Amino acid sequence: MLTIALSKGRILDDTLPLLAKAGIVPIENPDKSRKLIIPTCQEDVRLLIVRATDVPTYVENGAADLGVAGKDVLMEYGGQGLYEPLDLKIANCKLMTAGKVGAEAPRGRLRVATKFVNVAKRYYAEQGRQVDIIKLYGSMELAPLVGLADKIIDVVDTGNTLRANGLEPQELIATISSRLIVNKASMKMQHARIQTLIDTLRAAVESRHPA
């Protein structure tokens, strides 16, 4: 059995056409089904529907053989028990700092609100800056508006939500896209099969994004 972990939303919508190129098509529509384990047209391939932030955990610990996760999630997760063999070049966005338009630099320690705590710690440590990091799970844009934080670190797509709340994108931390990840043990045990899938997906990606 080959198990692939995916999260609902943009990544799922963009991944399914790529999997179809490899002959893997879910029997039920994952967006409409309440099931979290979705069978596919191949009897020995199934999809697991999990939270985006949990995809690396399922893959690293062997509950899934493969998965698709955003680079932002992988940067925050930082696990060592998985391979990242392929950039699928889907769900593209940017991980950036943002703050109030025209705001002056704070006199004391910078306060940064984000759900990407590990990324934030590494980013500011590399700059030699001491900051107070505030963990939030959503509505990041609110933090600078109510004085909770001076800046935020978040994923930025169009930037419209930032601008609508009087914020502006500032420093680029990373360019983000979704990656195929593979459990290390699975890669050894099912090498030929997984490598064939990787090669097929790579060809599908390259046909969409010719050099």
Swiss-Prot record:
InterPro entries: ATP_PRibTrfase_cat, ATP_PRibTrfase_CS, ATP_PRibTrfase_HisG, ATP_PRibTrfase_HisG_short. Catalyzes the condensation of ATP and 5-phosphoribose 1-diphosphate to form N'-(5'-phosphoribosyl)-ATP (PR-ATP). Has a crucial role in the pathway because the rate of histidine biosynthesis seems to be controlled primarily by regulation of HisG enzymatic activity. SUPFAM superfamilies: Periplasmic binding protein-like II. Belongs to the ATP phosphoribosyltransferase family. Short subfamily. It is found in: Cytoplasm. It catalyses: 1-(5-phospho-beta-D-ribosyl)-ATP + diphosphate = 5-phospho-alpha-D-ribose 1-diphosphate + ATP. GO terms for cellular component: cytoplasm. The keyword ATP-binding applies. It holds the Pfam family HisG. The keyword Transcription does not apply. Lacks the C-terminal regulatory region which is replaced by HisZ. Its EC number is 2.4.2.17. Gene3D superfamilies: Periplasmic binding protein-like II (3.40.190.10). GO terms for biological process: L-histidine biosynthetic process. Pathway: Amino-acid biosynthesis; L-histidine biosynthesis; L-histidine from 5-phospho-alpha-D-ribose 1-diphosphate: step 1/9. GO terms for molecular function: ATP binding; ATP phosphoribosyltransferase activity. Keywords: Amino-acid biosynthesis, ATP-binding, Cytoplasm, Glycosyltransferase, Histidine biosynthesis, Nucleotide-binding, Transferase. Heteromultimer composed of HisG and HisZ subunits. This is ATP phosphoribosyltransferase. CDD domains: PBP2_HisGs.
